[in-house]
Amino acid sequence: MLTVKIMTSAGPAEVAVGKPAGRPRFLVVLTHGAGGTPDTADVLAVRDAARALGAVTALVTQPYRVRGSRAPGSAARQDAAWAEIVAALSDSGLPLVQGGRSNGARVACRTARQVGAAGVIALAFPLHPPGRPGTPGQPGKSRDAELRAAGTRVLVLNGDRDPFGIPEPDDATRVVVLPGETHALSKNPAAIGEAVASWLGTLPGIGSRPPSVSGQAPPS
């Protein structure tokens, strides 16, 4: 594992890069939740599953966390810094999959089109503030539009006890609801790894199986 610093318009990011045992086949860039670090059980389960399939993996500590802040700041600034990080990591030309947990999942969805991601892995996607589900006549409380606007294939993994809500099946290419899990997604990392490995196998240029035709349509 190699840790590098990448300078962005929001300050330095720290990135832990790992390589697969064999020839690299694709790149997976992952990040943390709003006040967290990228070494949570769910993020590490994704990293390990991806690396077993031949991915170069990059776990990103975003600039605001490197500074010691727990608040991400504006979405525009966060997204701009993320795009700069991914650009610095993507010079190999490998197919890109990006993702994160909670706030990091939102960043991955919002920037997927811009960075040309082949797929997004959204862990514990925070559909709405706790206890405030989005309903007709109450705009702005549901964040499902971020999933739908990703412009690429999206895998969502949420716990069935997540107070931030659970996306609907048609909000993404695949929505996996894990029984007994809360927003932390910490109880069954093996199930997360299995779901991620299965889904990665459907991505063109990465897997050997045809992509799923259910849920969100892939980009043309």
Predicted regions and their residues:
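Active-site nucleophile loop of the alpha/beta-hydrolase fold
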Residues: 62-63, 122-130, 159-161, 181
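Short beta-strand/loop motif that positions the catalytic acidic residue
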Residues: 150, 156-158
